[in-house]
């Protein structure tokens, strides 16, 4: 996976995420529990006139209008959400926030039940900018594996690109057209057909 531009690979006991060639265009929603500054720096590097909305807690989501963003990014933050039901609710909200054909990007670490994580993550943003992150998750009941994340996204998004290796994963998904997921939305919200 070392030649993959957006994937993760292990090098000297570090998970390395290469984002040197990543470009985001359009209005972006950056959802994260910790502000690592990675996504903002990449976005700023490639856009002179830009709109990035950063949300770092659940309350911030209440003020977002539907169909407002072209892109949503979660960088090392999807795994911080406890319970599959909460992840499903968030993904549904993100789907609503995105414009038609909007893109949802996730970079995270592959954590299964019963495991703890204490990883050094090196993010290569450009030739001269590298970010070091220490990622710790000691809750053995939290699960945020690539497979479970992909399954949660499948209800509202089409996965158009993914990479999973050496403890990390990347998913790029595109919002489905509303008619394709209205039934799922009704089931989640408790409405009957």
Regions found by a protein language model. Give the residues of each.
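A short glycine-rich, Lys/Arg-flanked "PGG" loop and its adjoining helix->strand segment in the class I
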Residues: 88-103
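Core SAM-dependent methyltransferase catalytic element
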Residues: 155-193
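Short conserved loop adjoining the S-adenosyl-L-methionine
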Residues: 60-66
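C-terminal alpha-helical "lid/dimerization" subdomain adjacent to the S-adenosyl-L-methionine
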Residues: 109-156
């Amino acid at each position: 996976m070392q030649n993959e531009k957006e994937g993760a690979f292990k090098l000297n006991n570090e998970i390395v995420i290469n984002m040197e060639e990543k470009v985001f265009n359009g209005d972006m929603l950056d959802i994260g529990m910790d502000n690592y500054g990675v996504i903002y720096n990449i976005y700023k590097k490639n856009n002179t006139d830009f709109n990035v909305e950063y949300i770092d807690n659940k309350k911030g989501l209440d003020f977002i209008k539907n169909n407002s963003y072209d892109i949503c990014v979660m960088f090392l933050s999807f795994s911080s959400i406890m319970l599959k039901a909460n992840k499903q609710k968030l993904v549904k909200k993100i789907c609503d926030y995105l414009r038609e054909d909007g893109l949802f990007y996730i970079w995270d670490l592959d954590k299964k039940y019963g495991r703890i994580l204490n990883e050094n993550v090196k993010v290569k943003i450009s030739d001269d900018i590298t970010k070091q992150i220490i990622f710790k998750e000691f809750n053995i009941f939290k699960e945020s594996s690539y497979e479970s994340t992909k399954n949660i996204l499948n209800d509202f998004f089409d996965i158009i690109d993914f990479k999973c290796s050496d403890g990390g994963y990347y998913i790029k998904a595109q919002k489905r057209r509303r008619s394709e997921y209205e039934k799922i939305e009704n089931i989640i919200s408790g409405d009957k057909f």
